[in-house]
């Protein structure tokens, strides 16, 4: 790829092998050889099957479902790479699990997003490349470099290609206004906000819509769609308020529990997601459009390896 003294080695674990292969193809390299197996009691064993001594190693692993299995795989892989004398160990986490536990929501709660950062560093990670953290301040939980990529440009390009008219970009809550504004700026559209109250986890109640949506094509945007309660209630509220069409988009399609059923029965015309998380076959429904983050991540890896600026990818 370049005349760099140290070789680039790209490895993938089990969370999103398809995306990893796509990234390797874009970069024109082969994935490194490693095996992940289980002992009879369920313990994870990893064997790196080629020399990585003195190399700059990149490991692709989202900590998606099953979150704890994938996190443990990653930590063990980092330790194996460190003991095999990798020069640098760069972790590519398209989806950073536990990111929603970024603060103490109530007394005696843990801050698990910080704990995960500590675990990655202690295991031996040199750098983290991630995509659309739930809370940008999680970058401050690390004492190693972290490159925080954005999915909005990919989503914006898709909606531009559809040539939709009278667009309004809608944030499903107050916390997502900055994200909605970034998409709105790219689409040259106004924004609206759903004012909601959440009585308990994974249960959201839509209260009010701030902004003009009647007669417009509404595009809801969030970073994560989990059980889809928030996004489907918001979509239905927008339709009831006169929106002529409702689209939704997110970077990370967790889609757990009743999410697929809720999306199918909602007013959402199309849900646009990225492949930061691998979707199983049973979740691939006609309403869901999947976009690939492979060029973005491949470019980030290349720039880090070649010691070039990554900041151009943040815009």
From Swiss-Prot:
UniProt-listed Gene3D superfamilies: 3.40.50.2020
Co-factor binding details: Binds 2 Mg(2+) ions per subunit.
Catalysed reactions listed for this entry: D-ribose 5-phosphate + ATP = 5-phospho-alpha-D-ribose 1-diphosphate + AMP + H(+)
Enzyme active site: 196
One term of GO molecular function: ribose phosphate diphosphokinase activity
Cell location: Cytoplasm
List of residues binding D-ribose 5-phosphate: 198, 222, 226-230
Family under the similarity heading: Belongs to the ribose-phosphate pyrophosphokinase family. Class I subfamily.
Protein name (database record): Ribose-phosphate pyrophosphokinase
Top-level taxonomy: Bacteria, Bacillati, Bacillota, Bacilli, Bacillales
